[in-house]
């Protein structure tokens, strides 16, 4: 079964995300468990935790249908020791919040070398940061998102992702979230059926589908290989529709959250219905 949804607002409390997902016909969703642009956040209240779990149970949302995202400030490959420590502490707090909510994934961008250390050294720090957080948490898988490769961001190539995973000691608690827009921007062509088949074959060979824990389903305002991160609605922009047909008809993408981060939330319901219509009977 395909679990399709969107990154919905947690305004007013994380317990409100379930109703927002249901309102667009989703059977998956993503959320921030705290303000994504601040380092510090108030702890989750017991009332909010209970209400979230109850709403998930009533709505039929299991943990594997939910893909929380961490703060954009966190850089697990930070070249500065103080910046790295601050990022690790914040990441662990995010892991603990997922634990409290009974969730099993935490999606994150791997980090940036900031032109201060070699790429390989920063990738090693990301792996070490994941190990550090996994040792101090339970039950939550660290889900690395492929990036567009903008600026000094790591994680734009499948080789980067494989290198990070290789350095993680507990392979059962690390995974990948594949973003269609980011892959396209990073130079992975997804504009035809044959191109999609080739890219996903390369992903299988380099990373492995056993690590795929979620996807971000996005169109692209950016051009191919531009290394610029600009999302678009599914049926607009430069990516085209072939990749969405492929995903909806490939059972390797069953049973994981497929999350819209497209730019017009007023049509998320329409985009979810359109995706479902692509599945061949």
Curated annotation (Swiss-Prot):
Zn(2+) 3 binds at residues 182, 229, 231. Keywords: DNA damage, DNA repair, Endonuclease, Hydrolase, Metal-binding, Nuclease, Zinc. Binds 3 Zn(2+) ions. Coiled coil: none annotated. Pfam families: AP_endonuc_2. Disulfide bonds: none annotated. Its cofactor is Zn(2+). InterPro entries: AP_endonuc_2, AP_endonuc_F2_Zn_BS, Xyl_isomerase-like_sf, Xyl_isomerase-like_TIM-brl. SUPFAM superfamilies: Xylose isomerase-like. GO terms for biological process: base-excision repair. Zn(2+) 1 binds at residues 69, 109, 145. It comes from the Bacteria. Its EC number is 3.1.21.2. Gene3D superfamilies: Divalent-metal-dependent TIM barrel enzymes. Zn(2+) 2 binds at residues 145, 179, 216, 261. It catalyses: Endonucleolytic cleavage to 5'-phosphooligonucleotide end-products. GO terms for molecular function: deoxyribonuclease IV (phage-T4-induced) activity; DNA binding; DNA-(apurinic or apyrimidinic site) endonuclease activity; phosphoric diester hydrolase activity; zinc ion binding. Endonuclease IV plays a role in DNA repair. It cleaves phosphodiester bonds at apurinic or apyrimidinic (AP) sites, generating a 3'-hydroxyl group and a 5'-terminal sugar phosphate. PANTHER family: APURINIC-APYRIMIDINIC ENDONUCLEASE, ENDONUCLEASE IV ENDODEOXYRIBONUCLEASE IV. Belongs to the AP endonuclease 2 family. This is Probable endonuclease 4.
């Amino acid at each position: 079964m395909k679990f399709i949804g969107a990154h919905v607002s947690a305004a007013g409390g994380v317990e409100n995300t379930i109703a927002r997902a249901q309102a667009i016909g989703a059977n998956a969703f993503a959320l921030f468990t705290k303000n994504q642009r601040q380092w510090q956040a108030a702890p989750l209240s017991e009332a909010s935790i209970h209400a979230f779990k109850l709403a998930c149970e009533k709505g039929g949302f299991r943990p594997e249908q939910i893909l929380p995202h961490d703060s954009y400030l966190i850089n697990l490959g930070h070249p500065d020791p103080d910046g790295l420590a601050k990022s690790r502490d914040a990441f662990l707090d995010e892991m603990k919040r997922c634990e409290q909510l009974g969730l099993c994934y935490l999606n994150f961008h791997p980090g940036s070398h900031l032109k201060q250390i070699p790429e390989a050294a920063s990738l090693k720090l990301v792996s070490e940061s994941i190990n550090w957080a996994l040792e101090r948490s339970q039950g939550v898988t660290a889900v690395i998102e492929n990036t567009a490769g903008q600026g000094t961001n790591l994680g734009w190539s499948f080789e980067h992702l494989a290198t990070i995973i290789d350095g993680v000691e507990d392979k059962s608690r690390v995974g990948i979230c594949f973003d269609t827009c980011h892959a396209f921007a990073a130079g992975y062509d997804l504009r035809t059926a044959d191109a999609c088949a080739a890219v996903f074959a390369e992903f299988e060979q380099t990373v492995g589908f056993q690590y795929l824990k979620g996807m971000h389903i996005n169109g692209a305002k950016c051009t191919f290989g531009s290394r610029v991160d600009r999302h678009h609605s599914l049926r607009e922009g430069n990516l085209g529709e072939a990749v969405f047909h492929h995903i909806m008809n490939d059972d390797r993408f069953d049973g994981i959250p497929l999350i819209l981060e497209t730019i017009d939330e007023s049509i998320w319901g329409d985009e979810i219905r359109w995706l479902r219509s692509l599945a061949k009977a």
